[in-house]
Amino acid sequence: GAAIDELTNVYTAGAFAFALFGGYRRGRESWELSDGLYHVAFRAVNADRARRQPSLRALREEWETALAHGTA
């Protein structure tokens, strides 16, 4: 298996968001929050590690930006 690193933590945070706000499903129809927050979480769980946010800090900043723009 792959080493546990920052991108693994990003994935885990995204998966946790889907557990809390999507009933463990990743489809938009199950997501309880805004499209903006959905896209932040969906990016975090991308199978292509290079497409995920590069760090938990970057994930948090994207999440906060989505909240600040009234997309929650």
Which residue stretches match the model-derived regions?
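Conserved end of the kinase activation segment
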Residues: 1-7
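Hydrophobic anchor on a C-lobe helix of Hanks-type protein kinase catalytic domains
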Residues: 20-25
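Inter-domain helical "communication" segments and dimerization helices
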Residues: 28-29
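Conserved C-terminal C-lobe helix
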Residues: 32-47
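Terminal C-lobe "cap" of eukaryotic-type protein kinase domains
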Residues: 50-71
